Amino acid sequence: MIPDVSQALAWLEKHPQALKGIQRGLERETLRVNADGTLATTGHPEALGSALTHKWITTDFAEALLEFITPVDGDIEHMLTFMRDLHRYTARNMGDERMWPLSMPCYIAEGQDIELAQYGTSNTGRFKTLYREGLKNRYGALMQTISGVHYNFSLPMAFWQAKCGDISGADAKEKISAGYFRVIRNYYRFGWVIPYLFGASPAICSSFLQGKPTSLPFEKTECGMYYLPYATSLRLSDLGYTNKSQSNLGITFNDLYEYVAGLKQAIKTPSEEYAKIGIEKDGKRLQINSNVLQIENELYAPIRPKRVTRSGESPSDALLRGGIEYIEVRSLDINPFSPIGVDEQQVRFLDLFMVWCALADAPEMSSSELACTRVNWNRVILEGRKPGLTLGIGCETAQFPLLQVGKDLFRDLKRVAQTLDSINGGDAYQKVCDELVACFDNPDLTFSARILRSMIDTGIGGTGKAFAEAYRNLLREEPLEILREEDFVAEREASERRQQEMETADTEPFAVWLEKHT
């Protein structure tokens, strides 16, 4: 089932320097909660400055949903320490609140009013809040409080030059973009390994079902927790953050121009369902528009091709201008065993897997095959640890044992690990392979199995509160290592100044501005 990458691996072993200079970055979301686990109703902590313009700490959907962002980094340890500093400073500056350590929220009552993230009075700030108003009216606020970790990854120019020859200009844009689309297609075909190993949301609180019927065969504990005994990541299931109306958009990952055209079409395609919501009611705007996507970011995807945007530029226009610059992996649940929601083992595994995805052949993929890859993902998400579970290839009928496919994949990853260790020194990547391959013979070692044991004992709420309390105490006491207190104070002041400048510069009424920008 795994493509034959022996030739590509032999090529890599002859060109190890092609992997010198991998760049990566992390984003981690987390809900601010009170000591009893309920959602904080306070505004964004003052010490964190402006959520609109702060370089490292912002908010996602809700005012209580923090998002931490590391700068691009070539050093894994430095990146994780930077992320830990962001958590340390925040933990010391959020009063008695703490950070929820799980992807799935708990203690949010049905119909509870969840305050949308607020970004001030500039047109850009108001637009961001309006977009969130649209998300709330389309999908419900509860779904938007699910948190995850995003891992951003780019291969060095040396890799592309070793693989594609001496490239520059338009040629480089085309070939590098084609290379990243290969990564994306392989990710859709084999990325289910991420929730298998690191999925950490095998259960949900009963409030999450909001009284709606479900066809999933949930088991229920006395405290009202619903779980599937072999599930890995309900966050990635249809109960979590997915968008049914997007499933027939037909966006594919074979070609830059085709992909962008599909995306641009989706933001212009009217939706009957969303038209029923209306655009305005009693003078209050309800969504940006009633199209399938309000803006490009609404496209739900487990992985995205990205380029840093310039001021006023849409993500797709940035891709058209310069091609794909990096990949954003979006399938990671919060790691409940780490105070910062992600750890070194995961980052090293993702490095290995992304390199493998760049090496393995990836035939073009139609939108129907893309839909078929979802079958494997759903199996792993809902019953990934089930003994004897099998997976298919695309829309074909042949089935292969997950256990064997996983081991075959790790046989290749071990060779990538040897190459990465040879240029970085030590054996850190090979150790990660040895630790994780054991999860196929013993699924009890996976994150989902480990966290489910705790959840069955103490419930999601009890588990979440215990971890949140322990991490709060730990982070508050740890000294900063990379950033200093004065760096945070300076960024707070600079971010507030930037927001103020934006608000002062805006003279156009929001309605007029909105018309021009949508």
Swiss-Prot record:
Gene3D superfamilies: 3.30.590.20. Keywords: ATP-binding, Glutathione biosynthesis, Ligase, Nucleotide-binding. GO terms for cellular component: cytosol. Belongs to the glutamate--cysteine ligase type 1 family. Type 1 subfamily. NCBIfam families: glu_cys_ligase. It catalyses: L-cysteine + L-glutamate + ATP = gamma-L-glutamyl-L-cysteine + ADP + phosphate + H(+). SUPFAM superfamilies: Glutamine synthetase/guanido kinase (SSF55931). The lineage of its organism: Bacteria, Pseudomonadati, Pseudomonadota, Gammaproteobacteria, Enterobacterales. The gene is gshA. GO terms for biological process: glutathione biosynthetic process. It is an enzyme of class 6 (ligase). Its EC number is 6.3.2.2. Transmembrane segments: none annotated. InterPro entries: Gln_synth/guanido_kin_cat_dom, Glu_cys_ligase, Glut_cys_ligase. GO terms for molecular function: ATP binding; glutamate-cysteine ligase activity; metal ion binding. This is Glutamate--cysteine ligase. Pathway: Sulfur metabolism; glutathione biosynthesis; glutathione from L-cysteine and L-glutamate: step 1/2. It comes from Shigella sonnei (strain Ss046).
